[in-house]
């Protein structure tokens, strides 16, 4: 446990940052919800393309399988075919291929990793090419 003065200070920061949004933020949120929404179709289309490219490239890698995402901008590929658990896989992937992924153990599933496709198509393609090369050398 933290010393009492530190715990109180952290509690105050947490309280102020997660409750009672300021009035200007509330007005901005209302405008975002009620304002023009035409940009959403463009973003949905772009993220759908990114998701499909990442999904296809992941499933083309021997030892990795992935189901298609239903929301957010993450994929959760199964890496059990590589013979490694998620933390070791992610550590080595970062060190050897310079690709960051989140170990699935943090989400309750040690045979999976989480990757984001909230980046450019170029970055997605480059990262997944590096991931494929990394897995091929295992």
Residue ranges, per PLM feature:
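PLP-dependent class I/II
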Residues: 1-138
